[in-house]
Amino acid sequence: MEDALGLPRGAFTKLDPEDDAIFYEPPRLVCHIDDGAIAALTGFYRTILPSGGVLLDLMSSWVSHLPPEIGYAQIIGHGMNATELAANPRLSRWFVQDLNRDPRLPLDAASIDAAMICVSIQYLQQPVAVLRELARVLRPGAPLVVSFSNRCFWTNQRLSRGLAASSAAFMPCPSTSA
């Protein structure tokens, strides 16, 4: 399915063939971005995520970087480590699922008001399938915020070629011109 973008087969294959569940088994209660990046991301979330909405924090951890003063109806977290997700005070509920094995989200169609993928999209082996699932569960016009970092677990890398094309093809950005 990934070759729908004209990418070679295996373009998103990771360097390390080990099962992702093994890599994510030990909890990592650390910040994956620095204070400046956290402040910038929180500020952006403040402007784009709908207060009172249902949010999906895909590929989450023990912290979501959401503005502390804004309330949301529900924040659904997804990740690979139950300890990390359970430690996240902003999550209303959460689920553990390896999206590289099964990219289908256990959520109803058009049930989410906004979604975030914070510094993690580069670890997906089926990013197009996951983005299609996000398009399915997001309400029409709902934002998807994908943030990036210059940090990466090198043993768990995917080739980044095509991620921007994947995002643009399946979650087009509204025009920002006046």
What do these predicted ranges mean?
Residues 50, 125, 139:
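Short conserved AdoMet
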Residues 113-128:
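A short SAM/SAH-binding and catalytic strip from SAM-dependent methyltransferases
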Residues 143-176:
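Conserved class I S-adenosyl-L-methionine
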Residues 128-143:
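A short glycine-rich, Lys/Arg-flanked "PGG" loop and its adjoining helix->strand segment in the class I
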Residues 1-51:
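Class I SAM-dependent methyltransferase Rossmann-like catalytic core
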Residues 32-36, 40-106:
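Class I SAM-dependent methyltransferase SAM/SAH-binding core
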Residues 52, 112-113:
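Local beta-strand N-terminus motif with an aromatic residue
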